[in-house]
Curated annotation (Swiss-Prot):
GO function terms (MF aspect): ATP binding; DNA binding; DNA ligase (ATP) activity; metal ion binding
Species per Swiss-Prot/TrEMBL record: Pseudarthrobacter chlorophenolicus (strain ATCC 700700 / DSM 12829 / CIP 107037 / JCM 12360 / KCTC 9906 / NCIMB 13794 / A6)
Matching CDD domains: Adenylation_DNA_ligase_Arch_LigB
Protein name: Probable DNA ligase
Iron listed as a keyword: no
EC number(s) reported in the record: 6.5.1.1
Amino acid sequence: MLLDELVRTTDAVASTRSRLAKVDALAQLLKRLDPADIPAAVGLLTAKPRQGRVGVGWRGMSAAMGEPAADPGLTLADLDAALDRLQALAGAGSAAERAATLRGLTAAATEREQAFIGGVLLGELRTGALEGVLTDAVARAAERSVEAVRRAAMLSGDLGSTALLALTGTAAELDAVGLKVGRPVQPMLAGTGASVTAALETTGEASVEYKLDGARIQVHRSGGDVRIFTRTLAEVTHRLPEVVEVVRGFPVHDVILDGETLALGEDGAPRPFQETMSRFGADAARTTVLHPWFFDVLHIDGRDLLDEPLSERIKVLEAIAPAHRIPGEITADPEVAGRISRDALAAGHEGVMLKSVGSLYAAGRRGSNWIKVKPVLTYDLVVLACEWGSGRRTGMLSNLHLGALDPAGEYGEPGGYVMVGKTFKGLTDALLQWQTKRFQEIEVRRTAGTVWVEPVTVVEIAIDGVQQSPRYPGRIALRFARVKGYREDKTAAEADTIQTLRALLRP
């Protein structure tokens, strides 16, 4: 299939709010795919290419962008093969080969395809095809039940392979997909609550647990063989030998565990999130020791626990790994839940998770059975630039470039602004229309897809924290930034400083 056909479908999907229209467009595309293209297509449609990140940044992407092809000729298989080559590059000479591969890829792409490829490589692709929508589309295209497709995708951990099976196999083969030790499943996800009291009203009696600022891990053990997977189901066993040894010590033969791992200081307090994540990089040094903590068990010695209540799963977990169970208590009392939340924050953790004791493990699903509660941080930042939107936001300025005040010039000009991140989340239609008009009135220059503006507009941004990042001059980046609203009552000189944000980093 030509890449152009997939790109046009993603544009159509992104431009409509109708779920039925999205599902129909995607189902028609899936029916036309060659079976060999199905896994790659599903990865691209969900903005999660099967190769993951391939080591290309915006500078490399910008340098590779040349004159686009006049007519579509690039195939989906061509793009998938190029991503494979980019992922495999390492060592001496890899930078030059990566640049050559990128130039060859973009030269064969039309302007529309170049924008799509850039989104894929930079992790900024927004296709409008969320996994739930695409799951429905697979079911429609294959004439299978949505529940059968969803269950197979959750338990296989791979919507691409599930789509291939649904579209080319039998209903019985799809129904036969089940939990298997050694094959990761999509993790259960949590909703967000405003307070522990509000969360308890939803969950009823709950396991109230510390929410650690670590890396989600899923650990599979069969005998002496232990495998560790990330929340995106990438295998990282070889990077975490200390976790492997801990799990080998548990009194079980087969087990699947869900939990987190993080770095701790000598005082037992959590170290900065970036120290934990440094162990997951390609060149990770093992100077930082990671400690595993578990909050769920999905299987033990031939017994699947997915469909057993959390209260039972907790008993199993406490029997096999009491020293590595995430701190928490079962309660229906808001005062007790509040105390646990305060204790978690005092210990340096993010907040708490409240989990209904009767809940089953819904792999890959986000719902009201698990609710996270943590304090929200808000800061006043300055808009430095804004990127043109795509899909439904075509023609509107969308993704904001955010800067913090640097009064002393520690990271640039005194009194200037240091970029700390981007976000398009939280923008309503009204805000999109307002900022599209406003920012063109204060435009100072344009680059490809971006309008740079006078640094005079203050916007209130909610964040979950900051993390170390070499991408920006201040060496930090916002975590989970979203727009609360514009502060027309404030001047840019009143914005929060880069020093204030850097103080959020743990020492």
